[in-house]
Structures are given as structure tokens and as C-alpha cells.
Amino acid sequence: MKFKLKDKFVFLTVGIVLILCSWLLNPTLSPTAPTAGATYEYKSIHSPDGIGKFYQGREIAQVMGHTGASWLERPSREAEEQPSKIRNVLNLKPNDVVADIGAGTGYLSFRIAPLIPKGKVFAVDIQPEMLDIIKSLKKEKNISNVEPILATESNPNLPPESVDLAIMVDAYHEFEYPFEVMQGIIKALKPGGRVVLVEYRAENPFVMIKALHKMSQKQVKKEMQAVGLTWRETKNLLPQQHLMVFEKPQT
């Protein structure tokens, strides 16, 4: 009888160990893994620049925290990236509403705002510290039509059908829940509204940016198609980045 009890205990222990090992080897089986509409993969062995979470075959990059705010405002940014060219090709109307998703310090938000004097810019970020910087700069620059919006990792928190154009500059590749965020953006867009993504060119090995912080046109199109957006054009006017334009269907 003692041997049988011991035998049962061994089998039970082995079973528990096997279940735990299966969770470690395939975290998507873990009960704590998100079960959203998107298919995410999780890998314990991954790039040190990523979070171990994969979407559409791409590892999601780590977020640049608010401690890197000075890099966003660096004096050399205009010469290196020529962001002034971005706002000049957006074809904005004076009363348009623009959502700057992953706005950071509001670098682009404050440059777009004067182009839409009768509209507004939603400066959206998940970090309260970044929004504090935006609020401070808004007062300093005396710009009234920039509205800071605190988002979550999965929701941009924008009013439905309120946005004419949503723009993401070197931000999308860091979204922890890209599918859910894009769903939120699409809900916020007016019919026919546009999405503009600016990302460093993954196709070019001479763009000296970490691999997970670059995206190819093919990958961007794949991910935008997955949420129902239509590609309209890619503008090759920036020295290191793609500028890709997508559109929400009219109906």
C-alpha cells in the first residue's frame, strides 16, 4: 500500500512538472496570456531590445521611456530626420483634427498645430510624464489647440469618428497591443480618414537604428491590412524613414 501511494505521488508530481514546463516553453498557453482578437506569440528567448511578444511575425520593441525625452527634442533632429517635411505633405485643412499617437514631448504636435488654427491636435501618449512635458510646452509656446490625451497600452482613448488624420512617428513599432490600438484609432477616424506611419527603413542596413526600431514597407502594409486599412501611397521624401499613408474605408 505504501508503494502504491508513493507511486501515485510520483505520477502526480511528474504531471505538474510537465504542465509547468509546457507553459514555460509556450507562454501562449498560460492562463495569464491576453486573449484578444489579435494573435500574439510569446517567446522566452528574444532580442534584448524587444519584449518577447510577437505580432504578425514581428517582435515588439521596448518603449523609450520619458527619461529619453531630451533625445526627442535634440537640436540635430531636423538635420537628421527632416520632420518639417512631414507636416508639409499631410495636406491638412484649417479645421482638421489630428491625433498624434505616441506624441512623446509633442515635438510634432506643436509643429502641426499652426496648420490647423480652427482644428486641434490630440497629443496622445501612455506616459503621464510625457503629457506633463506637453502641458508645460503648451503654456510656454502659447498654443491652445493641442490637447493632451492619456492613453492606455491598448486604447488611445479618442472620441469616436472625431479624427481626420492619425499620425505615428517612430512609435507604432513599440505598441504593446498594436491590433487593439489600431482598432481604437480606426473607431476614432472619420469615414475616409487617414493614417500616416513614419518608420525607419528596415530594408536599408545603412540606417543605423536598432533592428526592432525599424519596419519594412511590407510589414507595415501587412499589419495595417490586418485591421482593415487601405494603403494609398508611400512618400520617399525623408532621408531615413518611410512615410506611408493609409485610409479608412468610407463605409
List each model region and its residues.
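Helix-to-beta-strand junctions that scaffold the AdoMet/dcAdoMet cofactor pocket
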Residues: 116-117, 175-176, 189-191
